[in-house]
Amino acid sequence: MKIKSKILIIAGSDSSGGAGIQADIKTATCLGVYAMTAVTAVTVQNTKGVKSVIPIPPIEIYNQITHSTKDIKPNAIKIGMLHSTKVINKVLKSLNDMRIKKIILDPVMVAKGGSKLITDQAIQLMKKKLLKKVSLVTPNLPEAEILTGVKINCKEDMIFAAHKLMQFGVSNVLIKGGHFKSKRIHDIFVNKNEIRVFTNNRFNTKNTHGTGCTLSTAITSFFSCGKTLKKSCELGINYVN
């Protein structure tokens, strides 16, 4: 198979294989994209919840990033689980070192079973320093509420929350609407020039573990191949569907 591009994935490992680094690698590979990884934490989990989180020392996360990218230059970066301020600071340092412009942030905060995966201090640092470094942020509804303080009950609230996120410096926002209990799912892409609503039918399935990881990596893969962010979001959503 011909490799279309290369991406670096900075995220946690999921022992069940459905989410995290494992889902990221599978997604990139299916789309013909070469995936490098920097593991931020090892999680013991399954589709029902997280049993434990074993953090990787921040310096070793930094070393994974710098050592791999000195040899293989990524076209884009996808960032997932960053559980502490020390980890975020090391990732910020590595981003400054690499100066890569195409960066997608999936702000993983709460596991499907309800386990919290990030400290409150790390959330504040993400808002203050990391969001302004990325091209696109892809929160689900609970994550968007945590980041903005906005209670989201409808599409208009999603758009308002997206504009609140842009106040932290990120230029493009994709808020995922899958947590609404509606028959149709609305994902909303927002930047200063436009608002695009992607609407799809909800599938009657319990196999939703890792859909956020899969989507953000699919978007990163398409973006790394030269597609625009809006088109990458459209193609990524279609891929997950």
Model-predicted regions and their roles:
Residues 120-195:
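Conserved phosphate/ATP/ADP-binding segment of small-molecule kinases
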Residues 31-36, 196, 222-236:
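Phosphate-handling active-site elements
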Residues 10-16, 195-209:
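Short pre-catalytic strand/loop immediately N-terminal to key active-site residues, enriched for Gly-Thr
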Residues 158-166, 228-241:
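Short, well-structured alpha-helical segments that form the helix of a local strand-helix-strand
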Residues 2-9, 23, 28-112, 116:
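Conserved N-terminal subdomain of the carbohydrate kinase-like
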Residues 22, 27, 146, 205-229:
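Short, small-residue alpha-helix embedded
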Residues 42-43, 83, 109-111, 178-180, ...:
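Glycine-rich beta-alpha junction loops
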